[in-house]
C-alpha cells in the first residue's frame, strides 16, 4: 500500500505551501528554544527552507541564532535591529495604526546552514498583548480592532512567500496570553515539548482544559464576517497535533534513570487519557494511519531527547546545534572528546528522525484534509 507521505509527494509538485508549526507549552524550561533551533537546522540540512520565528519577549532564540556572547556580538546585533525588521516592527502597521500595510520581514540568514533564516524577536512584542486580547475578546465588533486578529498570520504568510519557505517554526513564550492563543490557533500544526517532571504533567492537564476554549474561539473567528473582510483576514482554522517531545532527562548506562522513566510514563499516560480525548473532540488529529506509519503510539511521543550536558554551552557559544559542532569547536581531547562525539551522533540521529517524522506528518495534511 502506498503510504500517505508518498501519495503527497505527487501532490506537492503541483502545490507549494508553507507549514507553520508552533512549539507550545505554557510551562517554562522545557527546551522549546533549543529544540526549535536544532530541529530547524536539521530540516534545513535536509533541503527544506526554514524560518525560525522568535515570539518570546525573552528573545533567547534570537540570542542563540545571532550569537550574543561578546561586546562585539552585542554591537553587531544592535546594528541588525537598527537595519532589519523584527516581529514587533513587522506588526507595527496594524498594532500602531501606521499608514502602511504589513510587509514581509527581512529575515536574517543563519550562518552555517543554507536555507535557514531567523525572524528576530523583540522584547517589546509583549506590548501588543493587551490590545490583541481586547480585539480577540470582542471578535471584531469594534471596527478599529478588526485588523488585529489576522495580522500575525498575514505577516508570517508574507514572509514565508518572500523567502519561499517550506516550514515556519514558532518559538513561543510560556504563557496563556492572547498572543500565544493567536499564534497557536493560526498555525497548521503544533508540538508540545515537555521535560520528565511533575510540572509537565500538570501543564498537559492544563492544556487539555485550555484547548477547547481556544478552538471554539478560533472557529468562531474564522467565520466572523467582520474578521474575514478585514485588511488582514483571520485565516481558516486548520490546526493539527503532531505529538510531544520528552527531553532533558538523564541517562545512566544507556537508560533513563528510574525517576525520569516514571515521569516519562506519567506524561504519556496524561497525554493518552486527558489530552487525546480533547484532541479528538476538537478535530485536532490527523488520520490515525499517519501517526502509525511513523511508529507513534497512542501517547503521541515523537521522540525522547536526553540531557545535552556540556554540549549545550558549546552549542550556544558557537550558534551551532549540538550535533553539528566541529572538533575545533569542541576544544576537547582524549576520552572526553570521544564520548561527546558519540553523543553528537546520537543527537544527530534523534533530530534527523524527528525531522523526517515532521516532514511526513505535515506533508500528509494536504492528502487528509
Region locations from a protein language model:
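C-terminal lobe/tail of nucleotide-utilizing enzymes
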Residues: 2-11, 225-369
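Phosphate/oxyanion-binding active-site loops and adjacent basic polyanion-contact surfaces
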Residues: 32, 141-152, 200-204, 343-355
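Active-site signature of alpha/beta-hydrolase-fold catalytic machinery across serine-
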Residues: 38, 42, 64, 182
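Phosphate-binding loop that captures ATP/GTP phosphates
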Residues: 58-118, 223, 227
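Conserved catalytic-core segment of NTP-binding enzymes
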Residues: 21, 45-48, 147-280
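Cytosolic-facing regulatory segments adjacent to core modules
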Residues: 93-112, 117-170, 176
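Walker A/P-loop phosphate-binding motif and the immediately C-terminal alpha-helix
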Residues: 17-57
Amino acid at each position: 500500500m502506498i503510504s500517505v507521505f508518498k501519495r503527497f509527494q505527487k501532490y506537492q509538485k503541483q502545490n507549494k505551501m508553507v507549514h507553520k508549526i508552533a512549539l507550545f507549552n505554557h510551562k517554562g524550561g522545557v527546551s522549546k528554544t533549543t529544540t526549535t533551533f536544532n530541529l530547524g537546522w536539521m530540516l534545513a540540512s535536509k533541503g527544506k527552507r526554514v524560518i525560525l520565528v522568535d515570539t518570546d519577549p525573552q528573545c533567547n532564540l534570537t540570542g542563540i541564532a545571532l550569537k550574543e556572547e561578546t561586546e562585539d556580538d552585542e554591537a553587531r546585533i544592535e546594528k541588525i535591529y537598527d537595519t532589519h525588521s523584527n516581529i514587533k516592527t513587522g506588526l507595527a502597521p496594524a498594532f500602531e495604526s501606521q499608514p502602511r500595510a504589513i510587509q514581509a520581514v527581512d529575515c536574517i540568514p543563519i550562518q552555517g546552514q543554507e536555507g535557514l533564516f531567523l525572524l528576530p524577536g523583540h522584547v517589546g512584542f509583549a506590548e501588543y498583548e493587551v490590545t490583541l486580547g481586547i480585539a480577540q475578546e470582542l471578535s471584531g465588533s469594534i471596527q478599529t480592532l478588526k485588523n488585529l486578529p489576522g495580522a500575525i498570520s498575514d505577516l508570517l504568510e508574507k514572509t514565508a512567500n518572500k523567502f519561499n519557505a517550506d516550514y515556519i517554526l514558532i518559538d513561543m513564550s510560556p504563557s496563556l496570553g492572547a498572543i500565544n492563543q493567536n499564534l497557536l490557533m493560526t498555525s497548521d500544526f503544533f508540538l508540545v515539548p515537555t521535560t520528565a517532571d511533575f510540572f509537565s504533567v500538570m501543564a498537559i492537564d492544563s492544556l487539555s482544559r485550555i484547548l477547547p476554549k481556544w478552538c471554539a474561539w478560533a472557529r468562531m473567528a474564522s467565520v466572523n464576517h467582520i474578521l474575514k473582510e478585514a485588511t488582514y483576514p483571520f485565516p481558516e482554522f486548520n490546526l493539527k497535533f503532531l505529538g510531544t517531545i520528552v527531553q532533558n532527562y538523564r541517562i545512566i548506562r544507556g537508560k533513563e534513570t528510574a525517576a525520569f522513566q516514571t515521569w516519562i510514563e506519567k506524561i504519556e499516560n496524561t497525554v493518552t487519557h486527558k489530552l487525546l480525548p480533547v484532541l479528538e473532540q476538537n478535530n485536532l488529529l490527523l488520520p490515525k494511519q499517519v501517526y502509525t506509519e511513523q511508529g507513534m503510539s497512542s501517547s503521541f511521543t515523537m521522540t525522547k531527547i536526553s540531557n545535552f550536558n556540556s554540549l549545550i554551552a558549546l552549542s550556544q557559544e558557537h550558534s551551532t546545534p549540538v550535533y553539528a559542532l566541529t572538533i575545533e569547536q569542541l576544544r576537547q581531547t582524549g576520552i572526553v572528546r570521544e564520548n561527546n562525539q558519540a553523543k553528537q551522533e546520537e543527537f544527530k540521529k534523534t533530530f534527523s528522525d524527528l525531522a523526517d517524522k515532521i516532514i511526513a506528518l505535515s506533508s500528509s495534511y494536504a492528502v487528509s484534509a
